[in-house]
Structures are given as C-alpha cells and as structure tokens.
C-alpha cells in the first residue's frame, strides 16, 4: 500500500496556521517584522508633509474621534492577527470613538508587502485608506473596518485597486479610484512609516514608549501597551476602562 504524503504547500499552510494560533494564545503580535530593514519597502516618491483631513503626515497616523484617551494602533492591512484583533475588539473601539471616550490614532505599516505576490497590497491598501482620510475624514474608521471585513489571506495577491475603490463606494463615498491611481506620494508615506517603525524610537505625545515596532497589531492606550491575547475582548475592555 502506498503511503500518503502531505503536499509541501499543504504542510506550509498547516505550519503557518499553527504559528498563528500559538501566537494568539500567547498574546503576542504574531505578524512579526521578520528581517528588520529587509522587510521595509523602499519609497519611490516623495511623501507628503503636514496634515490633510484626518491624516497627520508628520505624526504618521490617521486620527479618528476626539476623546480624552488616546488609543494608538499600529497595523498592517494584510496581517491576519490584526484581523483577529479587529474581529474581537472592533465594536468596542467603534463605540469608544462614538461616545467620545477615545481618540483613535491609526498607524499603518506595510511590511507584509512581501506576502502579496509582488502586488504590494499592504502599501496600496494604506494608500486607499489615506485617500479616504484626506477626502472623507469622517469615514476613516468605516473604511478601516471594511478593509478587515474584506481582508485577503496573507500570501494572496490581495484586493485590486478597483476593489479597494469599490469598498469606499459601498460606504456611499465618492469614487476614490482617481486618488488611488495617483497615490504615489501616499504609498511613499506608508513605506516611510514602516521604515520609521523599525529605526525607532516610537514616541507617543512627545515621550518614548517603545524602541521599535516588533509586530502588528501593537496597541497602546495612553502610552500603556496592551499585552493580552488579541482575541481577549474582556482584557482589552478592562484596560480601556482602567486607563
């Protein structure tokens, strides 16, 4: 009788799934910036400066809400653990923004460009989010949530530019397709954010909080890092209420 042999691709998928599960149980950011600077895309255009709409180009984040507590979230649009965090805690964050409990600052990174078969999905998705931030500042959180509701698998091509534009249209926003087509500077900004996250230090409200971003999601509430499991909604709510 011939023995059944696992296909190498299938084995890799199993190992990846196990690593993700272990990372979530351990409460770590499993989407690690492996390779340091080698994982950082090189910007090919000049990044914008100043502020425009909800985007603080100098601060390297998009702002949502105006509450007294500051929630800083570093994420990569293709990171599956970021998706797990959003699934577990997205409604809590949304509610905290709506009732003016927090100011959410989204810090987009693009190191998983390496995992989208050459399509630079993370960079393109961040550029699309930036288009929304500039043109529709009140819809940043809705578009961010839509990116994760339609999150592609790590290792896939990701969404096309037309699909990224359609996510905005589905929210009732005017077409951002043209903005995405001309998003070279926004892509450069996204890539510069990633480089800065590795060179460090990471500062929040003028004080150092981390040497560098080791992985995503990285979540801080008023400068205090959430170290629980990404899918532990109760622990996240407790930290949010405490600070």
Residue ranges and their predicted role:
Residues 83-163:
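Structural alpha/beta surface segment adjacent to cysteine/selenocysteine redox centers
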Residues 54, 164-166:
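Polar alpha-helical coiled-coil and adjacent low-complexity
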Residues 2-117, 197, 205-206, 239-243:
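Extracytoplasmic thiol/disulfide redox context detector
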Residues 79, 130, 148-152, 173-181:
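A broad detector of the eukaryotic-type serine/threonine protein kinase catalytic domain
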Residues 2-7, 34-43, 170-243:
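C-terminal cap of thioredoxin/glutaredoxin-like
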Residues 74-76, 107-110, 147-148, 222-224, ...:
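Active-site-proximal beta-strand/loop segments in catalytic clefts of secreted hydrolases
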């Amino acid at each position: 009788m011939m023995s059944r042999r696992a296909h190498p691709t299938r084995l890799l998928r199993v190992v990846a799934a196990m690593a993700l599960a272990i990372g979530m149980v351990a409460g770590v950011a499993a989407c690690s910036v492996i390779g340091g600077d080698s994982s950082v895309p090189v910007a090919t255009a000049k990044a914008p400066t100043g502020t425009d709409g909800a985007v603080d180009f100098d601060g390297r984040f998009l702002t949502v809400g105006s509450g007294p507590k500051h929630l800083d979230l570093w994420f990569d649009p293709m990171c599956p653990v970021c998706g797990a965090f959003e699934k577990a805690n997205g409604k809590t964050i949304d509610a905290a923004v709506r009732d003016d409990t927090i100011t959410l600052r989204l810090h987009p990174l693009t190191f998983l460009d390496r995992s989208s078969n050459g399509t630079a999905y993370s960079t393109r998705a961040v550029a699309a989010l930036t288009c929304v931030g500039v043109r529709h500042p009140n819809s940043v959180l809705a578009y961010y949530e839509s990116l994760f509701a339609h999150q592609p698998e790590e290792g896939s091509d990701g969404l096309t530019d037309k699909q990224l534009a359609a996510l905005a249209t589905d929210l009732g926003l005017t077409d951002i397709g043209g903005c995405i087509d001309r998003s070279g500077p926004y892509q450069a900004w996204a890539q510069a954010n990633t480089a800065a996250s590795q060179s460090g230090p990471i500062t929040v409200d003028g004080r150092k909080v981390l040497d560098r971003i080791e992985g995503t999601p990285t979540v801080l509430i008023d400068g205090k890092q959430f170290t629980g499991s990404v899918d532990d909604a109760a622990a996240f709510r407790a930290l949010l209420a405490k600070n």
